[in-house]
């Protein structure tokens, strides 16, 4: 049997029967926890009891929220800046501007409680003599005493003044004050109760109607279930009760996904809107040196992203991604006139004017904001952001931070601002304190676990538990009781569904005590009674991995052709990662370096290769010190003509200096036994595979021909060198294939006036080829050489293996997804 118990209904019946509906306005003033409860109670009295003259029914906060233009008091923003300044002036604790602003919010609340409770902060000095706490309390005392010396009254003192005036009016009236409902601990409310004879009505009748419980796999399945439940119960008044803003956003995303209209009492974070992200990005640009990463954090905003921006991003990827000044943007080789004009306008808007103080930054950011997107203030959150920006500009003189620190301060201030979309709907999302007194057809309690609902005690950053008790602001024992009351009130509704995702943020959920208490009464079934999702939904998001067939596992990409020209690195990719080969050579996909991507190890490797190539090709026998300086000069010239961050250039110069001497000694020693050396030389190997002519191309870093006609192929490595086993197995085939090129005269080089190839006719049959990996690093040992001798028999085996490999792919043109032995895979995300 479903109970009709309702707190507000019971309360309405109580006041009508006790005072009479004709006397309510004359005799009563009713204080409720929030405005929603006030609206619901007014509706009950009007509709159910035909009360014509309603009593005063207001939320408690309305008493201390009246604004009087004649009163001069600090705004919340002004208070934060004033307190933040006091905190940073206390040098013993050395707060950063960001830390000071965070601390200011905490101290503002603490100092308000002290004033409202009429407690002397010096009381806490006497009980704990530890050096740590004494230092903290000296800081609190210093800040509090300096805070009280402000000429302008604080907003708390103004609220206290309003409260005392209301208390005086109430004492002089003949009206009874009733506090109805569950109120959170508050120093203003405490003072209000102490000063007046108040009737408290908080009787909660226990009722257990239709209560269901379900444990979704994760938070996203939980959000999907909520959307499904709301869709299935479209004719009902539904409350989704949540006090976690991050989870609320996930639930709202799924409600939006299924086009379900809802009212949100919790509100949205202004900082998370696109308009706020755009403004923060502009301020970051104005407060920092030119940085492409910061520029594209602005340009990639969904409100302004366009084809021109996408083309500019492609143009700037690769070597252009390190440009260090807006003037270089204007020197790019543009593909079309439209992009060129767009880029010139962008530079003019963002980089022409230089702001010198915080007010200049705020004023200029607003101007840029409106130039980039003229209708910006009409976007979601635009009106609230405009008001915030105007208020901040007004108090900008109080902001005592550097330009570098200001973007963090701005973002921190913005994170405390909410905006609301007032939409009437049968679905309402709110916190327990907002919804507990109201009546609904269906209540959903999501993520009902100890982390989210028990509201365990939190540690105050500046006060121990004993200190909170001395200052009379210890609410740790009250809070759990509050949530128990909220829970009991919510259970009065006709139908309640409790959800608790098994896993969230990598942790397993644990049931809260409230749920365990309810389970012990055998109210909740032990199995899920929520209907499973429709096929249309579950087919999208719930997949059973155990049902995959062997065919699914062995899926492969297929092609109608096989390339005629391959590089030696393509062969390695084909061996280690067939699908990566398919993506690169068949689909012609290439990775683009992200604009904000830092220089990589491979970039440093390319730099070293260029330096060593130029040094080796222009080698001049002179003393070692001159050679070392020549090598360093080559490096400096290359860096000067290369677009790189300044710090990267300095780092690479340092590394080159460290390894230069060791490389020159290595080079000189090897030259002693050489009759000829080739540097950065191109080679090829031509094969006919199953009727298809295939050319394999490569570039050898260095080929040495010794005085005894022995051949060594060297490969410079600044990264990891392959293991001997990887080479023997053919997993790292670069130097092996280059050896085969030598045997086929693929490098078109000769020695002793004869082609360098393996044939009897040449008169110079080669017995073996040595391959060498030269590891070059900026730490000792700077140069290490690993050599492996390859006999003709071994090379022939590798050649036959290469032919078999190519025959398979030329004939089948099938590239499996699941084989991946590559160290770096740029195409992994494409496999799904």
Swiss-Prot record:
It holds the Pfam family PDDEXK_1. InterPro entries: P-loop_NTPase, PDDEXK-like_dom_sf, PDDEXK_AddAB-type. It comes from the Bacteria. This is Uncharacterized protein RBE_0584.
